[in-house]
């Protein structure tokens, strides 16, 4: 007997796919939603991923959300655009607007979603080392524990 149906957005990603494995192992039905877009993906689902429902779709698309949320009790929202540059608009649209659309649909359509789990972005680790023509080598710090404790996840 299933413990319930879980939708994992970003389900083809590293964290999403491994979350699916664990949820399947512990008795949940799993539905994955992913756009399988490069450069993160090759356009195919991971071959090692266990058998579960897979949906090609985009969290920026209302119809994809509606289709993916049908019959779902739990959402693990991991879908994210990972590169801030060179396309900040796409980064914002996927990461912020896509998440807002999830909550908008749950409320507006009175969906029976019992719990939503949202993960932070990789920004909590800092931007990594890079070379800037003006400033030379730059290696920004990670996020200070004090900021993280206050829920201030993103850089200022």
For each predicted feature, which ranges?
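N-terminal Rossmann-like NAD(P)+-binding domain of SDR-like oxidoreductases, especially those catalyzing
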Residues: 1-156
């Amino acid at each position: 007997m299933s413990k319930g149906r879980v939708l994992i957005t970003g389900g083809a990603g590293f964290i999403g796919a491994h979350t699916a494995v664990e949820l399947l192992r512990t008795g949940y039905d799993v539905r994955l939603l992913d756009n399988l877009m490069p450069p993160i993906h090759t356009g195919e689902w991971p071959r090692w991923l266990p058998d579960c429902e897979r949906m090609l779709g985009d969290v920026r698309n209302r119809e994809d959300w509606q289709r993916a949320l049908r019959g779902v009790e739990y959402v693990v929202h991991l879908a994210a655009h990972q590169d801030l540059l060179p396309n900040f608009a796409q980064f914002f649209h996927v990461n912020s607007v896509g998440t807002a659309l999830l909550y908008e649909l749950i409320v507006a359509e009175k969906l029976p979603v019992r719990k939503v789990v949202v993960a932070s972005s990789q920004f909590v680790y800092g931007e990594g080392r890079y070379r800037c023509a003006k400033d030379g080598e730059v290696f920004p710090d990670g996020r200070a524990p004090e900021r993280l404790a206050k829920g201030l996840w993103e850089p200022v």
